[in-house]
């Protein structure tokens, strides 16, 4: 969707490009968006160099194998996304309508009031036991989006993800 949208709106995307003021001025652009990306931060924890310790890039992009009991360090947006990825095996329910409806208890036969009254959610069992760790004392995921944070927290709770705050490392 986004690639197509960029094409149809004639947005020029330049990846892995060093720029300076002169090159930006010479480019004659109407608008400039600098998206510098992000690199995983490696915490100073004894044992972090162990082969069992993976960055989110190792897990998501390189698809390195992940064990059955996983601690995710950091409960921001990336930590939540990685945790969501880890509890699913194969195709995520967000990519399969019938599985999504079943997981969230949505009545597709239009018999339940509002489509949900009296319908029990039936999430599939998590693929792994996941612990989502946060140093802050606030509620885990408190910094997520106001309109979507609740759904991310609920989805992980439904998969028995243990969300721990006030963690020291």
Regions found by a protein language model. Name each.
Residues 14-28, 36-45, 49, 56-144, ...:
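Rossmann-like dinucleotide/flavin-binding elements
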Residues 6, 29-30:
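Local beta-strand N-terminus motif with an aromatic residue
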Residues 1-13, 152-163:
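Helical element adjacent to the flavin cofactor pocket in flavoenzyme catalytic cores
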